[in-house]
């Protein structure tokens, strides 16, 4: 029998948490609800005091405080799990009158473990033996005497007279605390408001007292205290028992809708399946295995009477997926006969037969020798899912019905209804639907969009879980996604699809496309009841849900409301190159001493949460995107789209060069300059060194208004802000964009006196604080006459479709090929309404000289910003010396190396800047003194000395330097503020050169000669090139695309050839690439391709007495040739040809002579008489 509190050891250490724990015990088992409420209070009080000890700033609520604790590397996952369990179940008790006795017992046990951990931490009694936990048996008021004692102390305090003001305040604090304790101990029901206030006041009083104690210590003493707390906390875990680990797993299962209690819901204690009840029954006996031994499944999950899953759950599961083998054994050895006999003792034969038929369903394993009896197998150790150590955490499961199904890690359990739905699905049958329904005519797709959808379907049928689709910007990725989702839902292969975007504007654009798209007369929205950005959770009937990453982070990662892992079974990721970043794998040392939140992107955590097939859409698949999703299952390139006539080509870039951009700007040491602070203030400065600025530095480190003015004046010769062709200008910063807007308005106002103010505006993320208003501005740019010229930084770099953009101006240096391609993609769309036949790029910052080539892209990795204090903590922690990294050095040595490098950079910057700023100089002098005292060198030699002496010596030095890191952080801030202020230079500038860029060639004549030379010396380089030169009728569309891409790689684009010919011969001839090849190879005259087609058509019409129907089709064929250049079977599968019956119908129209007719067209087009 329990004769004293399990939490007795807290008495005198933290009387407040002790009193709360006593009250929780006092109400067990008579009032589980109050026990749960008190244990929630216990968790809050413990966390709040822990936050105080660890210098965590005050948080608004317990959830935020725990998130901050989670960022501290030493706080073990299990500790956070216990805090969260106490909080969540306590919230249920407060708000829903949750009154579960088992939960109350679990919270007492877990709170006890937490109390032991806390006690060891704050008392430094690290070897404190864990007392035996005794569960309170009945509601004896064990604390009656304690309440009486407290009341006597209260009366005595009231009678005592305080003399000084300090004594008065101390007495008041004591009275508040005593009243709080009494209110807590006497509370048998939910607290009244007065009791709540007393509790909070008591807590605040005690924390204030603790804070006052800390404040009396010196800074060095406080630092030493915090260090010791941290050091020891790293070593301490909760050391949960098997039973307590099961408590956590039980809670996870209950969160997912299962009845779970490892103590009472056990087979040995009579727990049996029940109709209409979803149970996780522990220690269920299985049949004998191959060795003849009978086993016991840790859990069998029953939906009603039906066993649906088996679970291997062990505290010491290190590699969780490896223990799935145990779960497989449970499934293979599961004895359905025994289950039927057990159920027949309680239920009718009909009920039993329906749930467990005598003819049992089973599934063959990979060996072919054994069969699985239970379809879903799980393994877990109760540890929260961590992407950076996936195999040692989370809930691993596998659907064993198909040998091709792989095991997966999940952060939550499947819900019962989700498993039933999965069990009822028939993937093979649903996959067959795609083969049985290949037609997509009702979807109105282009041929390549159909090919893309088929490629995705083929990958799904093969069992691929991550799928990448690469389609050039402007080729209808959203339309393709709509068609793909339509068919995926129609096939019933997927029940609910998440369309995930990383910005609200992209989501609204997608929703608009869904509303505009009609299938068989109905809008896509109306067919599937699509839920949008404002819908928090989709209803069961919802088939498609559009959401931003940010909203799902709040709903999934920062909410107590559970997000089922099977809420979506397919996720379509739009613009996948943007937010979806490859996560950095942590080293052993980083795993132990640094927070995983630094390493895992929110995007990745969201996608990892759901048990779903992920389909990513992008125009520019970077290396990191491919590493995540695999190679694209289908590609449709920009060049192919141009050849197909679905996108327009670009003219050769127009380079605008000013005198300062060409010569650079050189400033000498000692020169007086003005800097502009972020607040717009002018700061006088003297240069300490020579500085040489190139055009890439313009409007970053150097602001020359005359440069922007000269460029804007030159643009007036090419752009018309009163017309319908629109322009997008990319700037460096928001401040730069503001300057450019004013310069453009001033320049164009001179040429167009009637220019309206809104013809030229800025649209950036901070153009308006309301995101909806920014979206409205983008919509105006797209659909209204004004604005005509928009200046931006990076808001419109990707995903926004505005077909009327005909000009792209780069006033910002871009080195990333992916970003450049995305920016350029804003202008590639067709827009005949504004007479758009090509688009122009204006390069004002020499962008092509430094643009990265595609094959030099490197993975984009989340590289956490490691703070100086973190590195210092790591070298002063003895445990970091015991962790060996891959190169054989300790984690402390790695941290020391990073620390020295960071210090060296700060020292270098400080030395350079100290004469420029009196504030910095003063700080460096103080640092000189501190370093001299602690390390025997001045600040300038500090990093070198640390490197020389090593991490142990460095750790001792930093222990002598309290507040040193704070000083360094202040110094860094002041240096950055000084250096970030760009130099303002009021000098003249003028445009000295405007020319079209032809790759490596200075003149269009050189460009054409190089093209001719390439053709003449490489006739065998491409099979299609041979066909063009020797037998054009053999050229296929596939060959034409490959040929076009081959010339593109040599930087001989068709549009550049046309422009170069025009500049050298003063003739604008649309001869197409084939015309230029034949001119260079066989000397054909350069004539417009359309003229050649018309000549061939006239000749063919004169050869026969064609019917009116045949003449109409001849005209259509000629028009198709003008657009496509080459006609082959694929052309007849799309558009008007397809709608009118395809190639078969044309064969009948031309008496089975269609191929001969097409051959004549090809011959006559290139006839020497043409």
From Swiss-Prot:
PROSITE patterns: HELICASE_ATP_BIND_1, HELICASE_CTER. Residues 143-229 form a coiled coil. Keywords: ATP-binding, Coiled coil, DNA-binding, Endonuclease, Helicase, Host-virus interaction, Hydrolase, Nuclease, Nucleotide-binding, Restriction system. InterPro entries: EcoEI_R_C_dom (IPR013670), Helicase/UvrB_N (IPR006935), Helicase_ATP-bd (IPR014001), Helicase_C-like (IPR001650), Helicase_Restrict-Modif_Enz (IPR050742), P-loop_NTPase (IPR027417), Restrct_endonuc_type1_HsdR_N (IPR007409). It catalyses: Endonucleolytic cleavage of DNA to give random double-stranded fragments with terminal 5'-phosphates, ATP is simultaneously hydrolyzed. A motif (DEAH box) lies at residues 574-577. Induction: Encoded in the hsd locus, in the order hsdR-hsdM-hsdS. There is a promoter upstream of hsdR and another between hsdR and hsdM. This probably allows expression of the methylase enzyme before the restriction-specific subunit. Residues 714-879 form the Helicase C-terminal domain. ATP binds at residues 472-478. Its EC number is 3.1.21.3. The keyword ATP-binding applies. SUPFAM superfamilies: P-loop containing nucleoside triphosphate hydrolases (SSF52540). GO terms for cellular component: cytosol; type I site-specific deoxyribonuclease complex. The keyword Hydrolase applies. Upon purification after overexpression about one-third has the initiating methionine removed. GO terms for biological process: DNA restriction-modification system. GO terms for molecular function: ATP binding; DNA binding; helicase activity; type I site-specific deoxyribonuclease activity. It holds the Pfam family EcoEI_R_C. Optimum pH is 7.5-8.0 for DNA restriction. Type I restriction and modification enzymes are complex, multifunctional systems which require ATP, S-adenosyl methionine and magnesium as cofactors and, in addition to their endonucleolytic and methylase activities, are potent DNA-dependent ATPases. The C-terminus (approximately residues 1003-1170) is required for interaction with M(2)S(1) and with Escherichia phage T7 Ocr protein. Belongs to the HsdR family. The subtype A restriction (R) subunit of a type I restriction enzyme that recognizes 5'-AACN(6)GTGC-3' and cleaves a random distance away. The R subunit is required for both endonuclease and ATPase activities but not for modification. Has endonucleolytic activity that requires Mg(2+), ATP and S-adenosyl-L-methionine (SAM); ATP can be replaced by dATP, no tested molecule could substitute for SAM. Generates double-stranded DNA with no nicks, by cutting one strand then the other within a few seconds. Cleaves only non-methylated DNA, hemi-methylated and fully methylated DNA are not substrates. The type I restriction/modification system is composed of three polypeptides R, M and S. The restriction enzyme has stoichiometry R(2)M(2)S(1). The methyltransferase is composed of M(2)S(1). This is Type I restriction enzyme EcoKI endonuclease subunit. It comes from Escherichia coli (strain K12).
